[in-house]
Structures are given as C-alpha cells and as structure tokens.
Curated annotation (Swiss-Prot):
Protochlorophyllide reductase is composed of three subunits; ChlL, ChlN and ChlB. Forms a heterotetramer of two ChlB and two ChlN subunits. This is Light-independent protochlorophyllide reductase subunit N. Component of the dark-operative protochlorophyllide reductase (DPOR) that uses Mg-ATP and reduced ferredoxin to reduce ring D of protochlorophyllide (Pchlide) to form chlorophyllide a (Chlide). This reaction is light-independent. The NB-protein (ChlN-ChlB) is the catalytic component of the complex. Keywords: 4Fe-4S, ATP-binding, Chlorophyll biosynthesis, Iron, Iron-sulfur, Metal-binding, Nucleotide-binding, Oxidoreductase, Photosynthesis.
C-alpha cells in the first residue's frame, strides 16, 4: 500500500442521486430504454439532468408510484406491467428495457428482479428486461452505472479467446482513439462494456483481460472475475501519466515489447505535457480539497498533484476499495490524508479552517462555499466531460483552472468596486 494516511469517518452525508447515471447510459446505448420506478421527484430529476428537448423522443421515463402504491392499497406489479406493455407497444425499437429502482420503490420493497424475470418470460426474447437500483440510499450517484453493467454481465456470451475489455462509459470519440492506440500497440481484439448497442454484448471468459476506465465499478469487476476474466491492476486513465500506466498494464498482460510501447506513447506524452504547461502554471502550488462524491477523487488527486503541481489538503472518497485503488494510492504524496466516508459538517469545518484555493464538491455545497469566497468545482461535471486518455490531459486540467480564474475575476471586480 502507498504512503497516504488512510482515515475513516461517518455521519451525515451530502449525496447526489444514483438515477443520474441514466443520463450518460441512455446516450451510450440508443436501443435501450431506462424505466425508473419512482416518484414524481425522480421524474423531475431525470428530465432536468438530461436537458431533454421538447421535440425529442427520450429513451428514459418514470413509472410513477402514487400514494396508493406507497400505502400498499394498489398492486404496483399490475400497474407496472401495464406501463411496460404500453411503452413497448409505442416504442417497438426498444431492444433492452432497464427497470431502475429508486428510493420509493426500495422503501415499499418492490421486487423488480421478479418483475423483470416475469416480463422476460412473457416477451419471449423480443425485448430483454434487466433491473438494477439507482437509489441514493447508501450509494453514490456514479454507482448507478455499476448496477447497470453488473446486470448485463450474465448475458455476455462465453469465449476463451484472448481479448482486452474496456469497462466503463467513456465518450465515443475518446474510446475510438484509445482502441486505435491499443491496436497500434499490438492488441487487435478490443471491446467495451457497455456496448454502443445494448444487444451487441462483448464476450467474456478466461482469455479476457479487463481494464476499468472508472473507479466505481466494483460490483461489475467482481461479476466479470467470476466469469473467468482477469482484472488488470493499474492507475485509471486520467492524465498523461495515469493513461500511460493504464495502457502499459494492458501491453504487459499481452506480452508486448516494452520498447515498442514506449516508442508508440512517447510522442503522445510529449504533446500532452506541452498542452498541459499553461494550466500547470495556473495550478502549481494551489491547495485543493476534494470532498467525497463521485469516487473519482483519488485518481484526480494523483493527477492534480503529480502533473499539475497542486497541494492536496484532503482527499475524500465515499468508499475505498483498497485492492482496486492500490496503484493510485502508491502514487499519492506521503502522508496525504485520504478520508473514507463523510461527516459533512466536520468536513466543512476542515474546509473553513484550511481555506484551500479550490474545493471539489457536490452542487449542494458549491454555492454556500462560493458565498464564503472559496472557489469550487462541481464533481458531477467531471463525469459528463471527456477526460480519459493522454490526449485529454490538458482538457482535464482546464476544468480545474477555470474556477480559479473565475474566482480571480470576482476578487478583482470587488477590489475595483471598493
């Protein structure tokens, strides 16, 4: 294990809803539909987060649980069957239907797994029905994707062929560049989960080597391991250094010559470092406090310190999978406080005491901190931005330079007005 100081606290948390993952998953798989079984609040959240145009035909919706459902006065299963049948009659192009649990559906113990099993029998293969939980109870907002991908793993066909499997949603253009780069390295068979069509699932088996693109896919990784796949240990592909080490792990697993890997990646690394240079000048020496929300916090901290020169005040993470994060923890500076869990009031006290230059946090905490003249960065923005790979290192750094620049402008305006 690395030299970071691992700490733990518990208490009241500031969290965002796991249903948010539908926003990037429904864009990834256009032949899938995500049906949330929840309240009107769930419906408003998804519609607001996705920013649906008025004339668009969305690939998600909400089966709203009414007061009778919540009180147990109506058979929610019958009503859900009716909604599903109406949906499939109106949208025959749907190939995979995800039933997504929410806080309300979990409170009333609605068994969506049983509903999905029954519907699969009735639909007889015309549409595949899967289920997972997007509830915000005891989860982070990124874990919705973990639940969705875990539900897909049992449907993946068996294969003993040697292949590389990239697991986790990335921007299509970024994924295309990475796959092309792996091919240049000498790995010809590269597939991804989730696929771009929900029915075009990659195969898995003893010959499969898995690279995780996101650090919050713990359950999916466990399911793939149970299917015989090997999970490669590596830092995550954020920044030039992390992406290089990530790709080197795959090359090593496939026995590719080290010199060939170095020669292939060297020009990309040089270009990335040159593009990073102006942002490093803005970020170097600045102090950053990462509050726990997305589970990207540790890889981001490694990138911001090692490639941008930022000082790490505290690195919060909702949950710490030590095995999955071992490669990242080893790259953090000595005695970096890594806080697993959250007592939001105590963390805010530490933020106010330390007065960092930048705080990465949830939207609910950003405005109050900005009012106290502390620059903030929404953690959810990092999920929706194309930040993976060597080529995206400068774009990732810019996301952190921007709020500091904004804060400087505001401070200058205040000085002028005074």
């Amino acid at each position: 294990m690395g030299s970071a100081t691992l700490l733990k606290e518990s208490g009241p948390r500031e969290v965002f809803c796991g249903l948010t993952s539908i926003v990037w998953l429904h864009r990834r798989m256009p032949d899938a539909f995500f049906l949330v079984v929840g309240s009107r609040t769930c419906a408003h959240l998804i519609q607001s987060a996705a920013g649906v145009m008025i004339f668009a035909e969305p690939r998600f919706g909400t089966a709203i649980l009414g007061e009778k459902d919540l009180a147990g006065l109506a058979d929610a299963h019958d009503e859900l069957d009716r909604v599903v049948n109406d949906l499939l009659a109106r949208r025959p192009e749907i190939r995979t239907l995800f039933l997504v649990g929410s806080c309300p559906s979990e409170v009333i113990k609605l068994d969506l797994a049983r509903v999905a099993e029954r519907l699969n029998g009735e639909l007889q293969g015309r549409v595949r029905v899967l289920n997972y939980s997007g509830s915000g109870i005891e989860t982070t907002f990124t874990q919705g994707e973990d639940g969705a991908l875990k539900a897909m793993v049992p449907l993946m066909p068996n294969s003993n062929e040697a292949q590389l499997l990239l697991v986790g949603t990335m921007a299509n253009a970024v994924e295309d560049r990475l796959i092309h780069l792996f091919e240049r390295l000498g790995i010809p068979s590269v597939s991804s989960l989730p696929p771009r069509q929900s029915t075009d699932l990659p195969s898995v088996g003893p010959g499969t080597r898995v690279l995780l693109t996101q650090p919050y896919l713990t359950d999916t990784a466990r399911e793939l391991k149970d299917r015989g796949a090997e999970i490669l240990q590596a830092p995550f592909p954020l920044g030039a250094e992390g992406s290089r080490l990530w790709m080197e792990a795959a090359a090593k697993a496939f026995g590719i010559n080290n010199n060939h890997v170095a020669n292939t990646l060297a020009p990309l690394i040089e270009r990335a470092q040159k593009a990073l240079s102006p942002y490093k000048e803005q970020l170097a020496g600045k102090r950053i406090f990462l509050m726990p929300e997305s589970q990207l916090e540790i890889p981001l901290a490694r990138f911001l310190h090692r490639e941008c020169g930022m000082e790490l005040v505290e690195v919060g993470v909702p949950y710490l999978n030590r095995e999955m994060m071992q490669s990242e923890l080893e790259l953090l500076p000595q005695n970096t406080p890594v806080m697993e869990g959250q007592h939001v009031e105590k963390q805010l006290d530490r933020v106010r005491e330390q007065r960092p230059d930048l705080v990465v946090c949830g939207m609910g905490l950003a405005n109050p901190l900005e009012a106290e003249e502390i620059a903030t960065k929404w953690s959810i923005e990092l999920i929706f931005s194309p930040i993976h790979g060597i080529d995206q290192a400068a774009d990732l750094a810019e996301l952190f330079a921007r709020p500091l620049h904004r804060r400087n402008l505001l401070n200058n305006q205040l000085l002028v007005s005074v």
